[in-house]
Amino acid sequence: MENRVVITGIGIYSCIGISLEEVKNSLYEGKSGIILDQERKEFGYRSGLTGFVPKPDLKNLLSRRQRISMGEESEYAYMATIDALKYAGISQEFIDENEVGILYGNDSVSQAVVEAIDIVREKKDTQLMGSGAIFKSMNSTVTMNLATIFKLRGINMTISAAC
């Protein structure tokens, strides 16, 4: 059998839209997803400007067990993957019967590390961090979570940078 890579779908969940149609319209209309976040200013950032991405509600889509190891970036990627699979016409049945893999880009993940350290400092107990803390802190957290949720058996890779 010949080895090949096939890109079949596209999905997006971003500060300028949470669907291809929304992103397209934002680009055509010159809309920005940048907001002034007062909390950033309170933390001492010189600029309060940031991209605002609405947090998806996954309670009706995934079990608590599936959600516990997902940071925000995994949640956004999950929503984008759902759209990409729909766009491509790929069902879970197809995924179950074939070697399907994913490739995601994800940079350093620091929020989970900061939150875990805060818990340890406050409570003086590492057990209170929770079982999902280590998975949320990995650069490969997106790919790991999605490969598990969708039961992918192909090659799953994360493209990551140091900073």
Protein language model features and the residues they cover:
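Alpha-helix N-cap/helix-initiation motif
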Residues: 70, 162-163
